[in-house]
């Protein structure tokens, strides 16, 4: 089973979208094996967005992601990374397919509600950045015995 990192950003938390997003994730068949509401500090934000250091939008990005709580999750399932990315939609909500999280809820590219890992390497890095190994649980969903 593949794992991926997904985070409801401050705009999604502040707008009360955690429950809706979790519902969509579970209905899609992905399993949440870790989750926590947390406040990202500048140090963690800089590690998370290290590839953007030096870019013109970096300070705004750090300011936004540290502006309020986020809901961080580790998801597990077949093709979890691609599945989560399809559910999220394109970064720019105006280009996101109807029915995706960003098309339905995001307001602007800079306030696009959700983040998800884009590769197995970034998923592993982000999971290790936000979760200790003992925070990630293994369990069987009730439906698994029927499939």
From Swiss-Prot:
Q: Which UniProt keywords apply?
A: ATP-binding, Cytoplasm, Kinase, Magnesium, Metal-binding, Nucleotide metabolism, Nucleotide-binding, Phosphoprotein, Transferase
| A GO term from the CC aspect | cytoplasm
Q: Disulfide bonds, which pairs?
A: none
Q: Name one Pfam family in it.
A: NDK
The family database entries (SUPFAM superfamilies) matched by this protein are listed as: Nucleoside diphosphate kinase, NDK (SSF54919)
- The enzyme's E.C. designation: 2.7.4.6
Q: Which family does it belong to?
A: Belongs to the NDK family.
**Name the record gives this protein:** Nucleoside diphosphate kinase
Which species is this record about?
A: Listeria monocytogenes serovar 1/2a (strain ATCC BAA-679 / EGD-e)
